[in-house]
């Protein structure tokens, strides 16, 4: 079994991105599955170009995308990705799309194919705050999730995929009153998510 797990580069003035910091601290194998770890650019263009190529090249059984959602207090497992790019905050190339489709003529939305409720249950049993989220937004995280699910659907693959949002880690919240989580907890959460998804 192969698991493609990704995190993002820093964005929005942050010096680190907890999603990638946690990914790179994971072992190379979990529950007998090989982990393929990749950092993604925080650009609408970049994720649409890179992710389909990654999926074709690595042929993973499972894709777990992760990203930072500063302000959220817990690990959130995304239910759905929508075919929209819309943001007043520029991506890392300075691009601010307005009501643009990710892919012309593609479906309006895709649901995650990860066991989202089982993941939340397993995280809570591990004493990690978690919830299902019904919106991944319309920024690059949603674009990444939609791109992966669309790529898998078009190719007729049986790969399971979804997106996990994580809070700021403590060092990011030193100068701003935002919820935060220990990086070690985020790493543990990723391990729980991978194991739960592999069992589904």
Curated annotation (Swiss-Prot):
<comment type="subunit">
    <text>Homotetramer.</text>
</comment>
<dbReference type="InterPro" id="IPR033694">
    <property type="entry name" value="PGPEP1_Cys_AS"/>
</dbReference>
<comment type="similarity">
    <text>Belongs to the peptidase C15 family.</text>
</comment>
<dbReference type="Pfam" id="PF01470">
    <property type="entry name" value="Peptidase_C15"/>
</dbReference>
<dbReference type="InterPro" id="IPR029762">
    <property type="entry name" value="PGP-I_bact-type"/>
</dbReference>
<protein>
    <recommendedName>
        <fullName>Pyrrolidone-carboxylate peptidase</fullName>
        <ecNumber>3.4.19.3</ecNumber>
    </recommendedName>
</protein>
<keyword id="KW-0645">Protease</keyword>
<dbReference type="InterPro" id="IPR016125">
    <property type="entry name" value="Peptidase_C15-like"/>
</dbReference>
<dbReference type="InterPro" id="IPR000816">
    <property type="entry name" value="Peptidase_C15"/>
</dbReference>
<feature type="active site">
    <location>
        <position position="78"/>
    </location>
</feature>
<dbReference type="GO" id="GO:0005829">
    <property type="term" value="C:cytosol"/>
</dbReference>
<feature type="active site">
    <location>
        <position position="165"/>
    </location>
</feature>
<feature type="active site">
    <location>
        <position position="141"/>
    </location>
</feature>
<keyword id="KW-0963">Cytoplasm</keyword>
<keyword id="KW-0788">Thiol protease</keyword>
<comment type="function">
    <text>Removes 5-oxoproline from various penultimate amino acid residues except L-proline.</text>
</comment>
<dbReference type="InterPro" id="IPR036440">
    <property type="entry name" value="Peptidase_C15-like_sf"/>
</dbReference>
<keyword id="KW-0378">Hydrolase</keyword>
<dbReference type="GO" id="GO:0016920">
    <property type="term" value="F:pyroglutamyl-peptidase activity"/>
</dbReference>
<dbReference type="InterPro" id="IPR033693">
    <property type="entry name" value="PGPEP1_Glu_AS"/>
</dbReference>
<dbReference type="GO" id="GO:0006508">
    <property type="term" value="P:proteolysis"/>
</dbReference>
């Amino acid at each position: 079994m192969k698991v493609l797990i990704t995190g993002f580069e820093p964005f929005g003035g942050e010096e680190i991105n907890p999603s990638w910091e946690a990914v790179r601290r994971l072992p190379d194998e979990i529950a007998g599955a090989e982990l393929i770890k990749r950092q993604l650019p925080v650009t609408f263009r970049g994720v649409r170009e890179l992710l389909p190529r990654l999926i074709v090249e690595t042929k993973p059984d499972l894709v777990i995308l992760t990203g930072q959602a500063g302000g959220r207090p817990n690990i959130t497992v995304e239910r759905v990705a929508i075919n929209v790019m819309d943001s007043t905050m520029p991506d890392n190339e300075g691009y601010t799309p307005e009501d643009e489709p990710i892919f012309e003529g593609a479906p309006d939305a895709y649901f995650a194919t990860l066991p989202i409720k089982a993941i939340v249950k397993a995280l809570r049993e591990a004493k990690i705050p978690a919830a299902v989220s019904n919106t991944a937004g319309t920024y690059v995280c949603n674009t990444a999730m939609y791109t992966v699910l669309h790529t898998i659907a078009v190719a007729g693959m049986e790969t399971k995929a979804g997106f996990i949002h994580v809070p700021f880690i403590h060092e990011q919240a030193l100068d701003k009153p935002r919820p935060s989580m220990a990086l070690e907890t985020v790493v543990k959460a990723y391990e729980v998510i991978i194991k739960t998804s592999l069992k589904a």
